[in-house]
UniProtKB/Swiss-Prot annotation:
Cited InterPro entries: Pantoate_ligase, Pantoate_ligase_C, Rossmann-like_a/b/a_fold
Record organism: Geobacter sulfurreducens (strain ATCC 51573 / DSM 12127 / PCA)
Protein name, as recorded: Pantothenate synthetase
Record text on subunit structure and interactions: Homodimer.
PANTHER family reported in the protein's UniProt record: CYTIDYLATE KINASE/PANTOATE-BETA-ALANINE LIGASE (PTHR21299), PANTOATE--BETA-ALANINE LIGASE (PTHR21299:SF1)
Length: 283
């Protein structure tokens, strides 16, 4: 496995690979890798000749009072996880190489970034789309893999790729969960033992909504009441949003159907967690 920390070296590697007819898969990450990331890598491994995993804690997607400085980092462990999952190349650039002095160009997807996380984290998605566009230009992948836990992020990236005629395929991969149902996330490392138990309320509320939907409930108001009841029973849980949206457009809906997205963002203590499900999809 090769480690590349220079933008120029990564571009040179990818140009040579493409010239020789090889296909490239990219799994973009911020590091502190877990089995969710590994599932993306394993899928990427099956779909391309070369698997590149980027590890970069992107400063432009963090707000002024967010956790950029404390975001968990462990490069040595990340290298072991990536190699075990079949990575050929780790691209771990420096911030001053990605954003050199004088940098002033950003990619801003408009409508689909406004609700959900976009409402409570202004500027977040501008940072995400900018760094992802840069990674696409640097790594030059044929295919890139993203987890559906960040459902809105996946929708935003799909929109950017379509609107800017980027020549690659975007693959969304299922949420990977701990045995007790908690969605895997690097931020789970922040949770204390009691908070870790309390965090199970997210998946519990998703499961309750899915059960009601399967039993015939279509009223978003009644489904939301059930979700909120479960979340508010948990001490220290602060709800950012519990929203029902069309899973393709992210527009709000009043009557649920098979393609309705239930998206959650909840703070457990000081840790903001997100989770989601599409009501008609098997989990």
């Amino acid at each position: 496995m090769r480690i590349i920390d220079s933008v120029a070296d990564m571009q040179a590697f990818s140009r040579d690979a493409r010239r020789s007819g090889k296909t490239i898969a990219l799994v973009p990450t911020m590091g502190y890798l877990h089995d969710g990331h590994a599932s993306l890598m394993r899928e990427g491994r099956t779909r391309a000749d070369i698997l590149v995993v980027s590890i970069f804690v992107n400063p432009t997607q963090f707000g002024p009072n967010e956790d950029f400085t404390t975001y968990p980092r462990d490069l040595e462990r990340d290298l072991q996880v990536a190699e075990a999952a079949g990575a050929d190349v780790i691209f771990a650039p420096r911030a001053d190489d990605m954003y050199p002095a004088g940098f002033q160009t950003y990619v801003d997807v408009e409508k689909v970034t406004l609700p959900l996380c976009g409402a409570s984290r202004p500027g977040h998605f501008r940072g995400v789309t900018t760094v992802v566009a840069k990674l696409f230009n640097i790594v030059m992948p044929h295919t890139a893999f993203f987890g559906k836990k960040d459902f809105q992020q996946l929708a935003v990236i799909r929109r950017m790729v379509a609107d800017l005629n980027m020549d690659l395929s975007i693959v969304g991969m299922p949420i990977i969960r701990e045995p007790d149902g908690l969605a895997m996330s690097s931020r789970n490392a922040y949770l204390g033992p009691q908070e870790r138990t309390n965090a199970l309320c997210l998946n519990r509320s998703l499961a309750a909504a899915r059960t009601l939907f399967t039993d015939g409930e279509r009223s978003v108001a009644r489904l939301r009441d059930t979700v909120l009841r479960i979340l508010t029973e948990v001490p220290g849980a602060a709800i950012d949003y519990a929203d029902f949206r069309d899973s393709e457009t992210l527009e709000p809906v009043e009557a649920a159907n098979e393609k309705t997205l239930l998206a959650l963002a909840v703070k457990i203590g000081t840790t903001r967690l997100i989770d989601n499900c599409v009501l008609g999809e098997e989990q």
